Amino acid sequence: MKNSALVVIDLQNDITKNYKEIIAKVNEAIDWAEQKELWIVYIQHNNLSAGTRTFKPGTRGAELVPELNVVSDHIFTKVKSNALTSEAFTAFIQEHGISEFYVVGADAAACIKSTCYNMTKSGYTVHVLSDCITSYD
């Protein structure tokens, strides 16, 4: 299944505290992806807006949450909600011929939604693991 990837989106310290409700399931999904030999990638959001208080590059808030099982060094950053706007991530997809994605993380109403929409629009097969996503209240 090397043409498939598990994509873990924005499970960072500045994300909603609701991530704690899904972190065990996300880690189970990571274990499953390892067993199936899927690529496992992590997407981090960087907020470059002036005066921002969250997801500032180089801060604790921008770091992946400590409970997250990080099993690869395939960590990509984005500055917009759609993960495909990360040039490094899209280059990785193309380099490895990835065409199918399993998506987990946050925020369901923003980055998950935007990424899945744009992946589908780009012709990729997308699966959202519904027990592995969260949103703000």
Segments the model singles out, each with a brief description of its role:
Residues 1-5, 28-36, 53-137:
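Active-site-adjacent betaalpha module
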Residues 45, 50, 59:
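Glycine-rich, small/polar surface segments that engage phosphate groups of diverse ligands
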Residues 12-18:
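Short acidic, Gly/Ser-rich segments with clustered Asp/Glu that frequently serve as metal-coordination loops
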Residues 19-33, 37-45:
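A short alpha/beta connector and helix-capping loop motif
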Residues 16, 50, 137:
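Conserved protein kinase catalytic core
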Residues 11, 45-47, 131:
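Active-site loop/turn elements of alpha/beta-hydrolase fold enzymes
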